[in-house]
From Swiss-Prot:
GO terms for biological process: early endosome to late endosome transport; negative regulation of phosphatidylinositol 3-kinase/protein kinase B signal transduction; regulation of protein catabolic process. Residues 183-227 form a coiled coil. Keywords: Coiled coil, Endosome, Membrane, Phosphoprotein, Repeat, WD repeat. GO terms for cellular component: cytosol; early endosome membrane; endosome membrane; late endosome membrane. It comes from Rattus norvegicus (Rat). SUPFAM superfamilies: WD40 repeat-like. Residues 265-358 are annotated as: Disordered. The keyword Phosphoprotein applies. This is WD repeat-containing protein 91. It is a peripheral membrane protein. Residues 283-299, 344-353 have a biased composition (Polar residues). Residues 265-278 have a biased composition (Low complexity).
């Protein structure tokens, strides 16, 4: 505690010097020098007591102990009163012993003279009144203990420990917790960094194990694909099976009409043809035997001629057993071919080709099937390699995703306050919800507006206040803690639609965009005007209002003609204001000169959303033409980059249902938001938020992460980086708001 007090004293001195409060600073230094509590340093308090004893200043000793009782000991409970009394008694005895040891009996007699009234009725002091008159009190059994060095040390240590425990347990002001909070914060940050590294290590280990498992599965699938069981059985269809079939064939079988199949099969047999017949001759004999076979085929086998009679080999003529074996082999090859075609899902033309070749010749059919299998295997290997190759590490880790579901209609705005602790959301029915999400998701305030609301903005300095722009020309200041409207001001009756609100970072003013009714709005409609594409080309005003007085300061000039301003945004210090209008023009205003510094045609159609970049050297915009463009603010109209976005990222947003139900909503809230360093951008999509990487040289934005979680189109987003972990908000047309907590992957 003493260190915290000393540190706080230095901070207060620094603050007073910074503010110029020199008189207060001198007074503070003077009081610190005369501080009796010694900055809550126990050693200095004990030293002060000993110094008073050494100079025999009994009055000062009594006053100092009374001060300690009044300032410190009085805060203790009554159960500690006996301990305090014992310490006081021991302190006075310690003083008496010191006077006797230093041969100052006069000071001992003075002590009893001044304290007699207080001590004479206390039993523990009855024997001590004779102390100044004893010749050798250190040898007296009653007082010998108090003259020992051990007793003196024990008393000093006991007093020191008592004061230390007292200072540790006493309540302290909030400012003294500053140092402890800093240390605790540093400790938590160190622990978070250790846990972050462990998380990344575990993630890398999981990725490695998954990759190894997938590689093993891929290898197993490849081997299984290359060697199916029936292919292995086909490899065994050789002369050994032929010999087995020939040994079991009946002698009365008829001749086969397809002896050519056997003649085409034998030259490609894997085994030696000598096993077929011991009577097989040289190649010339084989060729003559083939000729005889073909000539005998013309007779169609009317009279069976046994080979034993003619003394010829098995190949010299049609043998009845060979016809049966040939038929069985051909059928088996056909069955295997069909199984292969079903497995590989070949095209109908390939199937017809395979069937024709199977009917013609066995080896050619096998070759055809092998050729058909090759491209399929290659394609499988390419797709597997493409999907399971080395992927770049994700820039963010999704820690959690929660849903806020207290809205029952499409969301228009959803914004996090400056502190990153609360969220304000507004739907098309005029329902405002203010809710927190840390540590638990909880609604803090809820309100329903009688008039339609079109815009929403958090106040910057007093972050408990909300600015709400209506469709009837008013701006309302709502206190989220008191849950009531503080005031409501009338902006303009001719231009009732308050399309955009932006509060200056200094908190002194806010800008307000007022526009005439849209070309499709109905005067008698009670529903909010959620817009229609291309129908916002109406006059508008851009006004500056004072936050404290709630009075209009000035009206900005909109050249070449007044037009509806859809979106507004300040830079970090409030010196610049950027606006996007319905005529597709971006205007940059100098808030010190209160004039338009530059303007340029940015989009074909309306500008839906505009923001400053992270370094504030550029302006980013999304327009009706479906493009996301970065503009250099130092050169008017100079594009830094341009990207085309999907239609579900820019709007208009469409929600379809049964029986032809269709809801169309033109963007009102923010369509994109950046991370803390401006390297990644969050946008809308049909199923959830999408995070893109910025700054790449590609012509297409790199999609890094899909947050998902929505069943309806997302219409507005926000990204808060006030906390250690980034918080992404995505709000959709079904009234659901997803809150996704991300952890940045620090490389």
């Amino acid at each position: 505690m003493a260190e915290a007090v000393e540190r706080t004293d230095e901070l207060v001195r620094e603050y007073l010097l910074f503010r110029g409060f020199t008189h207060t600073l001198r007074q503070l230094d003077a009081e610190i020098k005369a501080d009796k509590e010694k900055g809550f340093r126990v050693d200095k308090i004990v030293d002060q007591l000993q110094q008073l004893m050494q100079v025999y200043d009994l009055a000062a000793l009594r006053d100092y102990w009374s001060y300690l009782e009044r300032r410190l000991f009085s805060r203790l409970e009554d159960i500690y009163r006996p301990t305090i009394n014992k310490l006081k008694t021991s302190l006075f005895r310690f003083y008496l012993v010191y006077t006797i040891q230093t041969n100052r009996n006069d000071k001992a007699q003075e002590f009893f003279a001044k304290q007699a009234t207080e001590l004479q009725n206390q039993a523990e002091w009855k024997d001590w009144f004779v102390l100044p008159f004893l010749p050798s009190p250190d040898t007296n059994p009653t007082f010998a203990t108090y003259f020992s060095r051990q007793w003196a040390d024990t008393f000093i240590i006991s007093l020191h420990n008592f004061l230390s425990v007292l200072f540790q347990c006493m309540p302290v002001p909030v400012i003294l917790n500053f140092d402890a909070e800093c240390q605790r914060t540093n400790q938590v940050q160190e622990e978070n960094e250790v846990l972050r590294q462990k998380l990344f290590a575990l993630q890398a280990e999981v990725h490695r194990l998954k990759k190894e498992e997938q590689q093993q599965e891929e290898a197993a699938a490849l081997v299984q694909h290359k060697l199916p069981p029936y292919v292995s059985s086909m490899d065994r269809l050789g002369d050994s099976e032929l010999a087995l079939v020939c040994s079991q064939r009946p002698a009365s079988l008829s001749q086969s009409p397809r002896v050519g199949f056997l003649s085409s099969l034998l030259p490609q047999s894997k085994k030696s043809p000598s096993r077929l017949s011991p009577a097989q001759g040289p190649p010339q004999a084989q060729s003559s035997a083939k000729k005889d076979t073909f000539s005998s085929q013309a007779t169609k086998g009317k009279d069976p001629v046994p080979g034993a009679k003619d003394g010829k080999s098995l190949l010299s003529g049609p043998v009845p057993g060979e016809a049966s074996w040939t038929h069985q082999r051909q059928r088996r090859l056909q069955d295997h071919g069909k199984e292969r075609r079903e497995l590989l899902s070949t095209s109908s033309s390939q199937t017809q080709c395979a069937e024709k070749k199977l009917e013609g010749s066995g080896p050619e059919a096998e070759l055809c099937l092998d050729l058909h299998m090759g491209p399929v295997e290659a394609l499988a290997r390419v797709s597997t390699a493409g999907s399971e190759g080395d992927r770049p590490e994700q820039p963010f880790i999704v820690l959690s995703q929660e849903e806020y579901g207290e809205h029952h209609s499409s969301i228009m705005h959803c914004r996090v306050d400056c502190s990153g602790r609360r969220v304000a959301s507004l739907d098309v029915d005029g329902v405002i919800k203010v809710w927190s999400f840390n540590p638990i998701m909880q609604t803090k305030a809820s309100s329903i507006s009688k008039s339609p609301l079109l815009s929403l903005e958090w106040a910057t300095k007093r972050d408990r206040l909300l600015l709400l722009g209506s469709g009837v020309g008013t701006v309302r200041l709502y206190d989220t803690e008191a849950k009531k409207n503080l005031c409501e001001i009338n902006i303009n009756d001719d231009m009732p639609r308050i399309l955009s609100l932006a509060c200056s970072p200094n908190g002194a003013s806010f800008v307000c965009s007022a526009a005439a009714p849209s070309l499709t709005s109905q005067p008698d409609s009670s529903a909010p005007d959620i817009g229609s594409k291309g129908m916002n080309q109406v006059p508008g005003k851009l006004l500056l209002w004072d936050t404290k007085t709630m009075k209009q300061q000035l009206q900005f000039s909109l050249d070449p003609e007044p037009i509806a301003i859809n979106c507004t945004a300040f830079n970090h210090n409030g010196n610049l204001l950027v606006t996007g209008a319905a005529d597709g023009v971006i205007r940059l205003f100098d808030m010190q000169q209160h004039g338009c510094a530059m303007s340029w045609k940015a989009h074909c159609g309306e500008v839906y959303s505009v923001e400053f970049s992270y370094d504030e050297n550029a302006v980013n915009s999304i327009g009706e033409d479906g493009k996301f463009i970065q503009w250099n603010i130092h050169k008017s109209g100079l594009k830094v980059s341009e990207y085309s976005l999907p239609s579900d990222a820019t709007g208009p947003f469409v929600l379809s249902g049964y029986s032809g139900y269709k809801q169309v909503q033109v963007p009102r809230g923010r369509l994109f938001a950046f991370d803390s360093e401006g390297n990644y951008m969050l946008t809308c999509s049909a199923t959830g938020g999408l995070i893109y990487k910025l700054g790449s040289e590609e012509k297409v934005l790199e999609n890094c992460l899909s947050l998902g979680g929505h069943r309806a189109p997302v219409v507005t987003v926000d990204w808060s980086t006030a906390m250690d972990c980034g918080t992404c908000l995505t709000a959709s047309m079904d009234g659901k708001i997803k809150l996704t907590t991300l952890l940045a992957h620090k490389l």
